[in-house]
């Protein structure tokens, strides 16, 4: 565990510190690691964690969201930039090099030190680690190496613990303990209220986001800037960086995404840090509000991105609006947006609207230690700007929480500035709309399709000559960071006119925002950074705003190419609530309220929406929203936009469904009038936020599926795809009622409808022959079904029962009266039958004896001599078969069996259970098998009167008993003794084996009967 944490820490932090130095540090962190484990165990469940933090906020007694004035922020940024100037100047010259700056800001009362130590790993992969060190003010500010010493092992350990727990849920809070610092819980995940767009894999986060959708409108909005999609090789920062980044407003949009990072409570420093330039197309994760897209720090350098200390990437238009969600949040977010819009030429306005404990119940954020956001501003085309912006990026804003009076004063200042910003932004938006309309007309006339112009991340800081303003293609890639799978949106060109969502070559060492700026400079004027609130996107040309829940289409998408916005909606819960869409007043002003509200899409977790625009025909942009199960098609004016839905690797089944879905969606466009109704449904469905497999279907990294554009209707149309919800549900097992099945040792046993079905195998076997004579054939035909499944109804069984006949008295009686083998209606009949059978058998024997005496010679000629072994065999078989019937029949006719035992004729299966048959057989065949094999001479005389010699002769006459006969002579056994012999006597006294003894006893029994 330690070694893994070492590797993660060293790789993410960069090669600045060697692994050797980190090992002893990790050994020292064992105590911290244990504490972290305890903290995790205490906060295993998000709801509990949310309550815990809410109580913690209340304990802090922080009344209103305490906002820091822009002036204070700027001063802090200037001081930080001066401190970081020397390392930044060296690295800033290298666009790909990460800025290495450690901000030592000692907070006064909060005693919170936010030190971001940035280490230069390689020109290709740069990491900027943000660590939140909570320490006492008395402790001296940490320098870069110290910060790394504490943060690296701690973050690594926390990540390891998180992995060992195997929890998809991001750590609710991570305790980063300074040696002398008070333990403060940095809340990473719980505050998703502000970050409804945070794409946390855990459903709990989504639930929180749903709860906090009310606050989502207030949450800072990520300007519609294209975030670099993670290169396929890059893995999004997992563990702290993803989870904390979501919880942390730090979510800095990677690669020029105007990084508005909510400084919600920066979770273990690595929260949405985006690799400044090394990211290349560096993967971007959505920031907590889905605003800042965390560049899942796909470190091309091969460093493990898992460490929470992700590289903060300077965002070209990065506005880190730490909007404390409160009543003020809307105004603050608007102000921040305006600041961003105004900051097209100016560097990002760091509005630290850190809300401390806003009473808003939905917000569980503990901003007790108001963490100011550090805004990494992506360096734009020129290295000079890079130096300036990197300085700001490295800005470690130390905001000392003094007195609430000061906070109130700052709040008033912020509100005042926000109003100015809003006014300025509105003006800028109007200008942009006019410019975009002109550009659209020019482009349509030219009919030129820009080949994959990098949709610049509408950074306000990007300074592009307005002459290049013809094409403003903005792609907003909102990629929810799934810890499990890195988002890899390959720049796969899908359709010729449309722009592949990530056209930037991943290999370009230039920082992605810079690349975007360079491309923009060539063909496009980046519109002032239009902050798109979590749900709203402003499409200036058509005054149509799509409020894609988190899936924010890049504002000012009016490029003739159309919106190349791969919108990977973060949490579907961010559900596109119409109020949230309207919450972005500046962005949505242009849009009629109905359209703006109507165009809210509940983003789907897994799906990346790439909206591609053809140069001429206007096609509805259909955004798949599996969570809301709505496809929203937006028509950008005069621009063909095809929505290519890219899906992260999830299931091939979903892929299969996509082709069908792609064909269906464009045809379903419904007039915009439906939008209000549909929106309400969306809001209800969005809360459910269960992505439908059929809607999510695109193979990961697979070619974008361009839905056929329907050029006709310009107004946005909403297509209900909810009907496929039923199709996507797995078929449920159909259980037959009232039939229980058991699988026992491989046998499938079904219980019958009745407890004890009358028809059973023994009953069938015993009653088949007698019943065939007197019963209708239907009885036997229907019986087999009874034992099998109880299929035959009870009525039919009752009919059968009425047909049962007693074998003795011949009466018909219901089956309930027939006990045991179902042969006799009562015990009396059974006993009488046994007695009568035995009596008749004796009479038969007497008659047979007389007949034999009368025809001695004839019997001698006709009766074939039968060996004693055959007779014994018949006897044994009779016993065996009779034993089987006795067990099934019961005790009612056991006496009858004993009566038949002496002369059971061969295998009893022949007699079919009827004494009458036996009598008939013995009468018609006087020489029964028992009599065969015995010399008729011995039968003619009385055995009880035999002498020893006669007994000797009798035994000698039996087959194979010549030797045994001598033993009888020696024992002086005469006729009477012979009749008394049993097998035990023969075996014990004479040492005769069991086989011969049984045979002899069988013959003796025959003599007894005669």
Curated annotation (Swiss-Prot):
Residues annotated with Phosphothreonine modification: 928
PROSITE patterns reported in the protein's UniProt record: SAM_DOMAIN, ZF_FCS
Record GO biological process: cellular response to leukemia inhibitory factor; cellular response to retinoic acid; chromatin remodeling
A Pfam short name: zf-FCS_1
Biased composition (Gly residues): 279-292
Composition bias type Pro residues, residue spans: 453-463, 488-500
Chain sites annotated for binding Zn(2+): 806, 809, 825, 829
Main localization (coarse): nucleus
Tissue expression as described in the entry: Highly expressed in testis with lower levels in most other tissues. Expressed in embryonic stem cells.
Modified residue annotations for Phosphoserine: 651, 904
Keyword hit for rRNA processing: no
Subcellular location: Nucleus
InterPro entries attached to this UniProt entry: PcG_chromatin_remod_factors, SAM, SAM/pointed_sf, Znf_FCS, Znf_FCS_sf
ZnF endpoints (FCS-type): 797-831
Record CDD domains: SAM_Ph1_2_3
Keywords in alphabetical order: Developmental protein, DNA-binding, Isopeptide bond, Metal-binding, Nucleus, Phosphoprotein, Ubl conjugation, Zinc, Zinc-finger
Signals that turn on the gene: By retinoic acid.
Biased composition (Low complexity): 1-22, 464-480, 575-587
This protein's GO CC annotations: nuclear body; nucleus; PRC1 complex; sex chromatin
Superkingdom to which the source organism belongs: Eukaryota
Protein name: Polyhomeotic-like protein 1
UniProt organism field: Mus musculus (Mouse)
């Amino acid at each position: 565990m330690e070694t893994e944490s070492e590797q993660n820490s060293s790789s993410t932090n960069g090669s600045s510190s060697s692994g050797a130095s980190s090992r002893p540090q990790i050994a020292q962190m064992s105590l911290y690691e244990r504490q972290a484990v305890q903290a995790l165990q205490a906060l295993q469940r998000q709801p509990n964690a949310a309550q815990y933090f809410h109580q913690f906020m209340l304990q802090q007694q922080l009344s209103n969201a305490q906002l820091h004035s822009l002036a204070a922020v700027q001063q802090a940024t200037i001081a930080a930039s001066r401190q970081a100037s020397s390392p930044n100047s060296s690295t800033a010259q290298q666009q790909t090099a990460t800025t290495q700056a450690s901000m030592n800001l000692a907070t006064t009362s909060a005693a919170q030190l936010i030190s971001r130590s940035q280490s230069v790993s390689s020109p290709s992969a740069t990491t900027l680690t943000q660590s939140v060190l909570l320490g006492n003010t008395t402790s001296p500010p940490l320098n870069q190496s110290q910060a790394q010493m504490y943060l690296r092992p701690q973050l690594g350990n926390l990540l390891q613990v998180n992995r060992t727990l195997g929890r998809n849920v991001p750590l609710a809070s991570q305790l980063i303990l300074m040696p002398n610092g008070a333990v403060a819980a940095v809340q990473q995940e719980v505050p998703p209220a502000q970050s409804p767009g945070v794409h946390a894999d855990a459903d709990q986060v989504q639930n929180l986001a749903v709860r906090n959708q009310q606050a989502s409108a207030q949450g800072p909005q990520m300007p519609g800037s294209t975030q670099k999609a993670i290169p396929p090789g890059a893995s999004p920062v997992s563990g702290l960086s993803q989870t904390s980044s979501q919880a942390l407003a730090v979510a800095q949009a990677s690669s020029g995404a105007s990084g508005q990072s909510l400084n919600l409570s920066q979770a273990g420093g690595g929260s949405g840090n985006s690799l400044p330039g090394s990211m290349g197309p560096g993967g971007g994760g959505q920031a907590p509000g889905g605003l800042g897209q965390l560049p899942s720090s796909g470190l091309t350098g091969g460093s493990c991105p898992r460490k929470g200390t992700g590289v903060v990437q300077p965002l070209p238009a990065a506005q880190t609006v730490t909007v404390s969600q409160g009543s003020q949040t809307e105004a603050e977010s608007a102000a921040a947006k305006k600041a961003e819009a105004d900051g097209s030429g100016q560097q990002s306005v760091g509005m630290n609207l850190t809300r401390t404990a806003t009473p808003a119940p939905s917000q569980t954020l503990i901003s007790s230690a108001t963490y100011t956001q550090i805004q990494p501003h992506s360096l734009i085309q020129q290295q000079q700007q890079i130096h300036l912006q990197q300085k700001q990026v490295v800005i470690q804003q130390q905001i000392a929480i003094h007195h609430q009076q000061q906070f109130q004063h700052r709040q008033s200042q912020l509100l005042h500035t926000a109003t100015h910003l809003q006014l300025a932004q509105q003006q800028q938006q109007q200008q942009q709309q006019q410019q975009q309309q002109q550009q659209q007309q020019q482009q349509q006339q030219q009919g030129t399709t820009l080949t994959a112009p990098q949709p610049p991340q509408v950074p306000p800081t990007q300074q592009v000559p307005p002459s290049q303003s013809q094409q403003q293609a903005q792609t907003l890639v909102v990629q929810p960071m799934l810890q499990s799978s890195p988002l890899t949106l390959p720049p796969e060109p899908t359709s010729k006119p449309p722009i592949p969502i990530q056209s930037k070559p991943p290999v370009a060492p230039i920082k992605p925002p810079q690349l975007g700026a360079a491309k923009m400079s060539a063909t496009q004027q980046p519109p002032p950074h239009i902050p798109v609130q979590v749900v709203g996107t402003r499409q200036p040309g058509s005054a149509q705003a799509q409020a894609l829940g988190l899936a924010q289409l890049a504002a000012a998408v009016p490029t003739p190419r159309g919106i190349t916005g791969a919108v990977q909606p973060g949490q579907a819960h961010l559900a596109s609530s119409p109020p949230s869409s309207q919450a972005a007043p500046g962005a949505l002003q242009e849009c009629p309220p109905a359209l703006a509200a109507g165009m809210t899409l509940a983003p789907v977790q897994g799906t990346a929406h790439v909206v591609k625009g053809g140069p001429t025909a206007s096609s509805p942009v259909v955004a798949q929203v599996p969570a809301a199960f709505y496809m929203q098609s937006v028509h950008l004016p005069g621009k063909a936009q095809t929505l290519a839905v890219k899906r992260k690797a999830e299931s091939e089944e979903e892929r299969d469904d996509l082709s069908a879905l792609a064909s269906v969606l464009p045809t379903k466009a419904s007039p915009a009038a439906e939008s209000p109704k549909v929106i309400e449904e969306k809001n209800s469905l969005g809360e459910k936020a269960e992505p439908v497999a059929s809607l999510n279907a695109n193979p990961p990294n697979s070619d974008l599926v361009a839905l056929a554009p329907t050029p006709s209707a310009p107004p946005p149309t909403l297509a209900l795809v909810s009907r496929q919800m039923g199709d996507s549900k797995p078929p449920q097992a159909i259980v037959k009622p009232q039939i229980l099945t058991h699988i026992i040792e491989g046998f499938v046993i079904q219980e019958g409808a009745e407890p004890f079905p009358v028809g059973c195998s023994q009953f069938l076997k015993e009653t088949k022959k007698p019943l065939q004579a007197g019963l209708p054939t239907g009885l036997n035909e229907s019986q087999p079904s009874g034992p099998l499944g109880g299929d035959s109804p009870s009525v039919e069984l009752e009919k059968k029962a009425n047909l049962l006949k007693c074998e003795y008295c011949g009466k018909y009686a219901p089956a309930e009266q027939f006990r045991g083998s179902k042969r006799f209606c009562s015990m009396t009949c059974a006993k009488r039958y046994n007695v009568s059978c035995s009596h008749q058998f004796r009479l038969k024997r007497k008659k047979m004896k007389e007949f034999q005496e009368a025809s001695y010679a004839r019997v001698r000629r006709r009766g074939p001599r039968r060996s004693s072994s055959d007779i014994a065999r018949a006897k044994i078989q009779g016993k065996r078969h009779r034993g089987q019937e006795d067990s099934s029949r019961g005790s009612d006719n056991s006496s009858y069996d004993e009566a038949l035992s002496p002369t059971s004729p061969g295998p009893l299966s022949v007699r079919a259970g009827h004494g009458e048959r036996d009598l008939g057989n013995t009468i018609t065949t006087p020489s029964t098998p028992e009599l065969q094999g015995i010399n008729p001479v011995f039968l003619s005389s009385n055995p009880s009167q035999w002498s020893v010699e006669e007994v000797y002769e009798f035994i000698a006459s039996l087959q194979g008993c010549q030797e045994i006969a001598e033993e009888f002579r020696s024992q002086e056994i005469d006729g009477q003794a012979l009749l008394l012999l049993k097998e035990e006597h023969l075996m014990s006294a004479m040492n005769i084996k069991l086989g011969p003894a049984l045979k002899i006893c069988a013959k003796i029994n025959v003599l007894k009967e005669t």
